[in-house]
A protein has these predicted regions:
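Eukaryotic intrinsically disordered, low-complexity regulatory linkers and tails enriched in Ser/Thr/Pro
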Residues: 1-105
């Protein structure tokens, strides 16, 4: 398990919940985790995903984020810094999708 730290705490939905980090399942022996990703993982390994919001909303949001991050990583198997540059926009996009989904429920 590794944890990718967001560049800043991202306000989610109602304003009482923040995403501080995203947990990502990657085998510990994966040699493609190099450079900056390794540094981030070591520094923030103990950071928890801290959210105080409806569980179903959180699950939808994380599913959207993880799908986008997995696509990002498959395009950048060397785990370059683009993953970090794009992380905020990935989460912002996921939040918008989840908010639209909530309006349609």
């Amino acid at each position: 398990m590794i944890i990718i730290k967001c560049e800043d705490e991202l306000l989610m939905l109602s304003g009482n919940a923040y995403i501080k980090a995203i947990k990502l399942d990657v085998p510990d022996n994966d040699k493609e985790l190099t450079g900056k990703l390794d540094i981030y993982c070591q520094e923030f390994r103990k950071t928890a995903l801290s959210i105080t919001y409806d569980k179903k909303v959180v699950e939808k949001l994380l599913n959207e984020c993880m799908t986008a991050i997995e696509a990002e990583m498959s395009c950048a198997p060397d785990c370059n810094t683009n993953i970090f540059i794009d992380l905020k926009s990935i989460i912002d996009c996921a939040i918008k999708k989840v908010e639209r989904g909530l309006e349609n429920d």
